[in-house]
A protein has these predicted regions:
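Hydrophobic alpha-helical transmembrane segments of multi-pass integral membrane proteins
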Residues: 50, 110-124
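Alpha-helical transmembrane segments of multipass membrane proteins
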Residues: 52-57, 121-122, 197-201
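Hydrophobic alpha-helical transmembrane segments
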Residues: 41-45, 67-72, 110-111, 140-144, ...
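The first (N-terminal) embedded transmembrane alpha-helix
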Residues: 40-55
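Cytosolic-biased juxtamembrane loops and peripheral soluble domains of multi-pass membrane proteins
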Residues: 82-108, 126-254
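Juxtamembrane "helix-exit" motif on the non-cytosolic side of transmembrane helices
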Residues: 55-59, 125-130
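Short, hydrophobic transmembrane alpha-helix segments
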Residues: 53-68
């Protein structure tokens, strides 16, 4: 009788231990996802406010159609992509939200890229306000299509490469990705962002703002040079991958 009671007691104790571990794990996952969701929402709405301020304050009006068009083309796909990543790949989303570069070269590239956007947005808005230049409607439409396609390709690159982050680093257990767009060029994400960045001032309807974005490909070249040095030193198989895939961002050119 005592043996049966002891066995039953052990089963109950083990059940409670397992239940507590299950609740703890679920609670930890819930807290982690809640924190990620809050971080995502804060950065998303902060981005809307910042870009809106950079466009509409210098424009001196909210009646800036190209400004609204750009914000829609930028933030609607961003919202959709964010929802998909949050549901399907929260770890990748967390990495994409992290923007603390460790390399000095990369820190400089990030700062100059931010400066390009800041100046480009303000000059585009001032161009609209004072009528410095006029971009034909068909150019705005083509640029809008290019921006959307670039965003779609950007999402595809993220789907192919689970190690993709905003910072240049070699992650734990990282492997070389050589499928999809990575079979064509070694840095498809950067290739896509060049098209995306250069389409922005045209969507905003400003030739003068385009001049601000022209240096962006040069910054990408600097970033790639530094990144490949880091990957060759820390990522097994990357040297062989470089020999296999010759082009960095544009086939038959570079």
């Amino acid at each position: 009788m005592c043996g049966c009671f002891s066995a039953f007691h052990d089963i109950i104790i083990q059940y409670w231990v397992n239940l507590n571990e299950y609740i703890y794990d679920k609670g930890r996952v819930f807290m982690k996802k809640s924190k990620l969701l809050l971080n995502t929402l804060v950065k998303f709405f902060a981005g809307i406010i910042l870009v809106g301020a950079l466009l509409f304050l210098p424009a001196g009006t909210f009646h800036y159609f190209n400004g609204w068009l750009f914000m829609a083309l930028l933030f609607v796909p961003m919202m959709i992509l964010g929802i998909v990543l949050f549901l399907k790949a929260p770890d990748l989303l967390a990495k994409r939200l992290s923007s603390k570069e460790k390399e000095k070269t990369q820190q400089g590239v990030v700062k100059f890229s931010a400066l390009i956007c800041l100046l480009g947005f303000v000059i585009a808005a001032l161009d609209f306000r004072f009528g410095w230049s006029k971009v034909p409607l068909w150019v705005v439409i083509v640029a809008s299509v290019i921006l959307l396609i670039s965003y779609g390709l950007y999402a595809e690159v993220m789907r192919e490469n689970a190690y993709l982050s905003r910072t240049v680093e070699v992650q734990e257990n990282q492997k070389v990705v050589d499928t999809g767009m990575y079979k064509i060029v070694r840095h498809p994400m950067y290739a896509v962002t060049i098209w995306l960045f250069l389409s922005i001032p045209l969507v905003l309807g400003s030739w003068w703002a385009l001049l601000c974005f022209v240096p962006y490909p040069i910054l990408i070249a600097v970033r790639i040079k530094n990144e490949e040095k880091i990957l060759e030193e820390g990522l097994p198989g990357y040297t062989e991958y470089k020999q296999k895939v010759r082009w960095k961002i544009l086939p038959f050119v570079w």
